[in-house]
């Protein structure tokens, strides 16, 4: 079944935080005349935006609560992993969201996008990791093998006391997420691959064996990696597919609001 929602096309098929990084409070004060002028300006901008093609959505505007405190730290032991974490502001959901990243990004991406803050506001604990050699995580020899990458991710989740993970895996992070999925999918409550790498390393039968609820997400303008990964990921028996319109490979950057809507809908409907 195919449908459309907010510009998206969809198909249905331990270590503890160490360093506080916030919160940030933004305050505004305007007169009535300024508010009226601002409203008129926004209306004109909206009309121009609708009528003309434009750049990707601004990613610096937080969609979640700017008062959320983002914590950070390092996991213990060998090959420590740097992480950013938010705790639920309201009544906590059972699942916890673990955010990986692509080649050009790191855990800070999810803070800049407002994803961490939004998940906290919606009652989710969320942890964003810096993969080895990225951000504040040092390179690791363990990451040179498939088994080592799976073990590294499993250890990070254990050290962070993540019990019911929903793993969000864009692009390069597929090198870590897919080996972990194949070996430890019973530990995952959900899986959100975003045009991940390494799908070609596994057979149809291996994908069929994974029963984890999966949201396959990709950008309409990603004509290479998204299509390659989709061919294999479709073999996951419990999946849905969402295509973000007018978005490229890093679709969560190009369409952050659509991405957040789709992600929250998936999380909110997990058992």
Curated annotation (Swiss-Prot):
Q: Which InterPro entries does this entry report, sorted A to Z? A: AB_hydrolase_1 (IPR000073), AB_hydrolase_fold (IPR029058)
The catalytic residues are 171 (charge relay system), 222 (charge relay system), 249 (charge relay system)
> Which EC number(s) are documented for this chain?
3.-.-.-
Pfam family of this protein, just one? Answer: Abhydrolase_6
Q: Which sites does the entry annotate for glycosylation?
A: 67, 201
Entry's Gene Ontology molecular function annotations: hydrolase activity
Q: Which GO terms describe its cellular component?
A: cytoplasm; membrane
Localization in the cell:
Cytoplasm; Membrane
What SUPFAM superfamilies does this protein map onto? alpha/beta-Hydrolases
Membrane topology per record: Single-pass type II membrane protein
UniProt entry keywords in alphabetical sequence: Cytoplasm, Glycoprotein, Hydrolase, Membrane, Signal-anchor, Transmembrane, Transmembrane helix
Q: Does the keyword Membrane apply?
A: yes
Transmembrane ranges, per UniProt, are: 35-55
Annotated signal sequence range: none
Q: What does this protein do?
A: Possible role in granule neuron development.
Similarity comment: family membership = Belongs to the AB hydrolase superfamily. ABHD14 family.
The protein's name: Protein ABHD14A
| Organism from which the protein derives | Homo sapiens (Human)
Q: What is the lineage of its organism?
A: Eukaryota, Metazoa, Chordata, Craniata, Vertebrata
Name the gene.
Answer: ABHD14A
């Amino acid at each position: 079944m195919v449908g459309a929602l907010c510009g998206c096309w969809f198909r249905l098929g331990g270590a503890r935080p160490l360093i506080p990084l916030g919160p940030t409070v933004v305050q505004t004060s305007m007169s009535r005349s300024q508010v009226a002028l601002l409203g008129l300006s926004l209306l004109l901008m909206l009309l121009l935006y609708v009528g003309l093609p434009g750049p990707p959505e601004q990613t610096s505007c937080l969609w979640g609560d700017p008062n959320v405190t983002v914590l950070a730290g390092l996991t213990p032991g060998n090959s420590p992993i740097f992480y950013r974490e938010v705790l639920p502001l309201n009544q906590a959901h059972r699942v916890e969201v673990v955010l990986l990243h692509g080649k050009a990004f790191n855990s800070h991406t999810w803070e800049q996008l407002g994803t961490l803050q939004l998940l906290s506001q919606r009652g989710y604990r969320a942890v964003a990791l810096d993969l080895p050699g990225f951000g504040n995580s040092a390179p690791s020899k363990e990451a040179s093998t498939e088994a080592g990458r799976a073990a590294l991710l499993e250890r990070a989740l254990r050290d962070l006391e993540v019990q019911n993970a929903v793993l969000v895996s864009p692009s390069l992070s597929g090198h870590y997420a897919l080996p972990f999925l194949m070996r430890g999918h019973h530990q995952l409550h959900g899986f959100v691959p975003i045009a991940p790498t390494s799908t070609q390393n596994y057979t149809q039968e291996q994908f069929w064996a994974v029963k984890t609820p999966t949201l396959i997400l990709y950008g309409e303008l990603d004509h290479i990696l998204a299509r390659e990964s989709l061919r294999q990921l479709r073999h996951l028996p419990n999946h849905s597919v969402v295509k973000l319109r007018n978005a490229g490979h890093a679709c969560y950057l190009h369409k952050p609001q659509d991405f957040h809507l789709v992600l929250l809908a998936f999380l909110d409907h997990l058992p």
